[in-house]
């Protein structure tokens, strides 16, 4: 097994935290979206995925308009429903929640242990370093599902809960893409390296294109926050730093868009998880 010190010796020093720069561009973040600590999930695709996920506990409440209730009863005949007008549903939810006539209150998913997600080392994973905007994280889960990522690794304290606006933006993807929460990302990266993963950090100042950094071995893509990019310590724990080439000259990407490109490239270079497989 290669040590962290030996791995660091093989790459150039980490020159900065921000994913911006002359090649990689600036990963722009959106304004913080609504989040909800009380366990509400809203929006048709997010609710339907939650109701069909066998890993979830039975919902405490299901709110629906009369039209949505008919559709839900056809799919889930025994589901207890509270039929309300659109405005009444909206008053139960955080301001601005686009509920599409349906919402469910359910305990948060427990997630999986890092070792269960990463052992054996196969395919590719995505780690988010303090990406906090629920809309962005939800969109990233959606891309992770589309391109067959094995799972997503989040920091325990500096990441949104997998519900509310995040679940709506993910359109059900949080139910199919396994997620692991860890206290310390740097220690998690050391563990992943010991398991045989190559750690690829996205950083605009890197001279290495992402397609070159992904050499077919199992890989962890590490994305930095919307405003600050990779933190220095996290960058120093990567085997290699890579940038996304932007030949058009417009060097500014939302972090969710950058993650989608990186995940697509990983699916080509490393290989995707089989559709429908969890963990």
Language-model regions, residue ranges each:
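N-terminal positively charged helical leader segments and presequences
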Residues: 1-119, 278-279
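Short, ordered loop/turn segments at secondary-structure junctions
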Residues: 66-69, 86-89, 157-159, 184, ...
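Short, hydrophobic beta-strand segments that form beta-sheet elements in well-ordered domains
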Residues: 41, 60-66, 199-203, 221-224
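Structured adenosyl-cofactor binding patch, chiefly the S-adenosyl-L-methionine
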Residues: 48, 146, 168-173, 232-279
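RNA substrate-binding interface of SAM-dependent RNA methyltransferases
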Residues: 120-207
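Active-site/ligand-binding-proximal alpha/beta "capping" segment
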Residues: 200-250, 254-256
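Short amphipathic alpha-helix with an adjacent loop that forms part of the alpha/beta core around
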Residues: 114-120, 191-193, 211-215
């Amino acid at each position: 097994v290669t040590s962290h010190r030996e791995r660091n010796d093989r790459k150039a020093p980490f020159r900065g935290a921000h994913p911006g720069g002359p090649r990689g561009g600036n990963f722009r973040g959106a304004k913080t979206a609504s989040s909800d600590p009380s366990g509400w999930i809203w929006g048709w695709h997010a609710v339907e995925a939650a109701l069909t996920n066998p890993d979830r506990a039975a919902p405490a409440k299901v709110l629906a308009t009369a039209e949505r209730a008919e559709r839900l009863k056809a799919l889930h005949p025994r589901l207890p429903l509270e039929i309300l007008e659109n405005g009444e549903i909206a008053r139960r939810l955080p301001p601005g929640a686009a509920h599409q006539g349906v919402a469910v209150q359910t305990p948060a998913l427990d997630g999986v242990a890092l070792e269960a997600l990463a052992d054996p080392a196969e395919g590719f994973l995505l780690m988010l370093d303090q990406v906090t905007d629920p809309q962005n994280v939800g969109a990233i889960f959606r891309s992770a599902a589309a391109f067959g990522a094995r799972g997503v690794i989040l920091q325990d304290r500096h990441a949104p809960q997998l519900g509310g606006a995040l679940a709506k933006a993910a359109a059900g993807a949080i139910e199919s893409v396994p997620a692991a929460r860890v206290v310390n990302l740097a220690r998690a990266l050391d563990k992943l390296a010991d398991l045989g993963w190559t750690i690829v950090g996205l950083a605009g100042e890197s001279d290495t294109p992402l397609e070159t950094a992904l050499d077919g071995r199992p890989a962890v893509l590490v994305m930095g926050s919307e405003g600050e990019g990779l933190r220095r310590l996290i960058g120093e724990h990567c085997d290699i730093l890579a940038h996304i080439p932007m030949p058009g000259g417009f060097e500014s990407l939302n972090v969710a868009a950058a993650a989608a490109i990186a995940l697509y490239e990983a699916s080509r270079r490393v290989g995707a998880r089989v559709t429908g497989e969890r963990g």
